[in-house]
Amino acid sequence: MKHIFTRALTTFTFTLLFLASFGQQGTELLIQANRATLERDYTQAIALYDQYIKLNPEDFRGYFNRGTTEMNARKYTEAEQDFTKTLSLNPVYKEAYYYRGQSFVKQKKYDLAIKDYTHILDKDPRSVPFLKLRAKAYSENKQNDLALQDLDFAIGIAKLEGDLYKRRAELKIVLHDIDGALKDYHAVGKLMPEYKMVHYIKGNLYLEIKETDFACEEYKLALDNDVVVADRAYEENCQ
């Protein structure tokens, strides 16, 4: 949810800047609605967008901004409808596919989310953000092999993006590929030093394959990084 709000913040900021030269009726309503969204007063924002849309029913931005606000308010069905309307007015608006896909995922409509992400990837097959989104949707839809393909391809494009290795490691655990997961978590440790849980997770994985000495080394590193949960694992397995 934090990621959705952050992305929406960027969109709304852009809209506010654009509106300086926007003379269409209802401009002030849209500014007020955007401001209410930024202040997380979603009920007020939606009411203002409603008024704006009545005045400007052919302006896709009213529906799109209302949709992102509905996403933050967890009104996913309404958001889906607004993003669909956005795309009927502006079929090439990439952000609407992003958000509609997210609304589908929240409603567990994974096939529809995958369809939206694939629509963008057909035009831009090297889009790492959309590869990550589709991989997540595939995974939620129990299509783990396809999710792995997307993550493999994304890593080939963005070799230094630690989050990709983390996602792939988590997927490999589901696929019972412990050795593969350990290799990816090793990359995570190098690329994401701020992720303190990596040594604790690696310790648990080493225990699964009966490599207790390696597990204990990882638990020690986790404790050095103030990962409190590693203390019990170390006591139970390493003393």
Describe each model-derived feature in a short phrase.
Residues 25-27, 60-61, 94-95, 128-129, ...:
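Helix-start (N-cap) detector for alpha-helical repeat units in TPR-like alpha-solenoids
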Residues 26, 204, 208-239:
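Terminal, low-structured helical/coil segments at or just beyond the last alpha-helical repeat
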Residues 38-39, 72-73, 106-107, 136, ...:
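Register position in tetratricopeptide repeats
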Residues 65, 99, 133, 167, ...:
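Canonical tetratricopeptide repeat
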